[in-house]
A protein has these predicted regions:
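Ligand-binding pockets and gating/stacking loops
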Residues: 1-459
Length: 459
């Protein structure tokens, strides 16, 4: 007898199952094939987009400008990296040890000083999460195991009682011009998430998986014949694909080696009383408690075939030094340190597992910070320059791309803009030359995917 635990009934399972098989196809669950199968356009690689919401400072991260006047240069000083002649902000001590493994772009600008959520969702993507383009072209799930191809993870995906999406300035899980079925899969929004994904089935029938799939295929053919699939939505389909693929363990960090979890964990780096005077104190807590584990989750999902993963903790990089936000020095201690630790742990783990040619990590925010330090020892909004870190597949190791002006406020070389970054992500995921030959690609998707060149100097 097939049944879901808790909220899903047997009828719900059958609805999910039949819709899932209709949209994905049982043959695709076994193996994608056929010359026209869009799955052939997928590189099999993963883009992990770590969004630094609030707007990180270029000075205190990767462009400290220590020869500039005191009103401009990094307030946290600088730290030497293992790349001769390259310095990072003083809080980036762990990443400084790995600077020979990634690229820093010092000429990237979003062009906006507003709290939106570009570049992950922006006018340049027609208001869609970048990963929704992968889903629209390839499909929503990996046909081999049911893993969602586009996932957006927030603190509540890894730490109970921490918040979910912070959508005040835009929806991270927006599909823009595409239907809601192409929105990112968001773990942690439905309560007992791990249990919700487990299909409870007696051992005898579980062992007879082939018979089970044959039965579901029969159901699929029946509903195709009478049209009863009408009215069932894509979310049910996606849920079915997840449980049938057995991918719930990928979202369960308790399955991970305890030493690995401890290596990623950022919860011990800060204390609540250090920011309790700020209105954004709960955001700081969520960031500290979850960032490392979110990066571990991203690695687990990448290993299991997820194509695009959005990671963001909360609104923590807006370091104005006011009633709501920390200033630059305290902010980099309590926000920059977890970032430094989590990204360095991720790089070490990926390198140890030999995954560096399979994963692209992008870390940036919606804007940078002003060259001049304000009267409260913070920095304000600035769209002229934004820090950008790139690591992994297709990325030169130990490189700096572009240069900033003397005051660190604008590019001194050709600007890298959001369409170039989007193109870099999608070029990593898709076979663009083959995609151009297809006649079934929506015009909106083609405009975004082919509308700009990837970042110059990569590859």
């Amino acid at each position: 007898m097939l049944s879901f635990q808790d909220r899903l009934s047997r009828r719900s399972f059958l609805q999910v199952g039949t819709c899932g098989l209709s949209s994905l196809g049982l043959s695709q669950l076994m193996a994608a094939s056929g010359e026209n199968d869009p799955w052939r356009l997928f590189s099999g690689k993963t883009v992990i987009f770590l969004f630094q919401h609030g707007g990180p400072s270029q000075f205190e991260t990767f462009d400290p400008k220590m020869s500039a006047p005191g009103s401009i240069r990094s307030m946290t000083g600088a730290t030497s990296t293992n790349v001769p002649g390259t310095e990072f902000g003083g809080t980036m001590n762990q990443l400084a040890k790995h600077a020979d493994k990634f690229t820093i772009v010092r000429s990237y600008q979003t062009g906006s000083s507003a709290h939106k959520i570009q570049p992950i969702v922006s006018p340049d993507s027609f208001g869609a999460n970048i990963g929704s383009y992968l889903s629209r072209i390839i499909g929503t799930n990996n046909p081999g195991n049911g893993m969602p191809l586009n996932v957006a993870a927030f603190p509540n995906a890894v730490v109970e009682d921490e918040p979910g999406p912070f959508n005040t300035f835009g929806r991270f899980a927006d599909a823009g011009p595409f239907s809601k079925g192409f929105e990112p899969f968001v773990p942690g929004t439905g309560g007992n998430f791990q249990e919700d994904l487990k299909l409870h089935i007696d051992r005898l029938r579980l062992d007879d998986r082939k018979t089970l799939l044959q039965s579901l295929d029969k159901i699929k053919r029946q509903v195709d014949a009478d049209g009863s699939l009408e009215g069932l939505d894509k979310f049910q389909s996606q849920a079915f694909d997840v449980v049938m693929g057995g991918v719930s363990d990928a979202f369960d960090l308790s399955q991970e080696n305890q030493k690995t979890i401890e290596g990623y964990d950022t919860g011990h780096l800060t204390r609540f009383d250090e920011w309790k005077d700020k209105n954004n104190k709960n955001h700081y807590k969520a960031n500290s408690n979850s960032l490392g584990k979110l990066m571990l989750l991203a690695r687990r999902l990448a290993e299991r075939g997820c194509g695009f993963i959005t990671i963001t903790t909360s609104f923590v990089w807006d370091m104005h030094a006011d009633q709501n936000n920390l200033g630059m020095v305290r902010g980099m201690d309590y926000v920059g340190s977890p970032f430094d630790h989590a990204v360095a742990a991720f790089i070490e783990d990926v390198e140890a597992r030999g995954l560096q040619n399979d994963i692209l990590l992008v870390a940036t925010g919606e804007m940078g910070r002003t060259p001049n330090i304000n009267a409260r020892a913070g920095r304000d909004h600035w769209g002229g320059l934004t820090p950008l870190l790139l690591y992994g597949t297709g990325i030169p190791r130990g490189h700096i791309i572009g240069q900033s002006a003397k005051d660190g406020g604008t590019p001194a070389t050709t600007p890298i803009r959001t369409p170039n970054l989007i193109a870099t992500c999608l070029d990593t995921l898709l076979d663009i030359p083959q995609l151009r030959l297809r006649v079934d690609v929506p015009s909106e998707a083609l405009k975004v995917i082919t509308g700009a060149e990837p970042i110059a100097g990569l590859g």
